[in-house]
């Protein structure tokens, strides 16, 4: 078994989710995202699973199946150069990608300072960068609510969270802990229809 990871560290998106709320069902303990990921990383490191970190899969080719099994060749670029792994099965565990602005149908110019919630979260929690001094958050799912609180804690003035639906999409506890406790307004039913800006 081998794990190919494009980042330098295992853990995926959990590394930037520094808020608690993970691990309750699996470990019967409330953990942050990095703590939760580390539990699994520690388990992996006790095995003979080969780890290819800071590596990018370039292609997956399937050969002709034999009577017993199919053969797959995974070509990857690693810090040591190009490698090929051969196996009977390939599991794509790539997480998810956030929808871009064009995918959620928001027209307008493309100025700097418009981020997906995940990118803003990475900037703050991993890169130690502040995305801006003022923010408006579109969407009241849990990540939007958590980022409203996180931005506020980092000194960004969050003008409000705007939700297209007439109700918040995140957990009620997150509305209370992330918005109500910090005085961040939640605007239900309006949404962004256009982005206007320069640079």
Where are these regions (language model features)?
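Beta1-alpha1 glycine-rich phosphate/pyrophosphate-binding loop at the start
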Residues: 1-39, 43, 131-177, 185
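Fold-independent oxyanion-binding glycine-rich loops
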Residues: 6-7, 17-18, 54-56, 77-79, ...
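Short glycine-/acidic-enriched loop or helix-start segments at secondary-structure transitions
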Residues: 13, 62-63, 101-103, 146-148, ...
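A Rossmann-like FAD-binding core segment of flavoenzymes
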Residues: 39-76, 152-199
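FAD-binding core/adjacent interface of flavoenzyme oxidoreductases
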Residues: 40-134
């Amino acid at each position: 078994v081998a794990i190919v990871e494009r980042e330098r560290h295992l853990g995926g998106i959990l590394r930037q989710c520094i808020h608690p709320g993970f691990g309750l069902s699996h470990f019967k303990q409330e953990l942050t995202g990095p703590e939760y990921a580390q539990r699994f990383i520690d388990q992996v490191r006790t095995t003979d699973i080969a780890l290819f970190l800071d590596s990018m899969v370039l292609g997956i080719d399937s050969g002709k199946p034999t009577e017993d099994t199919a053969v797959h060749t995974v070509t990857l670029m690693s810090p040591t150069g190009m490698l090929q792994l051969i196996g009977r099965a390939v599991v794509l565990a790539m997480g998810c990608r956030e929808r871009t602005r064009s995918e959620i149908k928001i027209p307008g110019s493309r100025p700097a300072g418009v981020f997906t919630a995940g990118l803003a979260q990475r900037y703050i929690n991993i890169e130690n960068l502040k995305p801006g001094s003022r923010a408006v958050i579109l969407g009241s799912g849990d990540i939007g609510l958590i980022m409203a609180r996180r931005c506020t804690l980092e000194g960004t003035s969050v003008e409000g969270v705007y939700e297209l639906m007439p109700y918040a999409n995140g957990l009620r506890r997150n509305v209370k802990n992330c918005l109500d406790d910090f005085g961040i307004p939640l605007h239900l039913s309006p949404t962004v229809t256009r982005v206007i800006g320069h640079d």
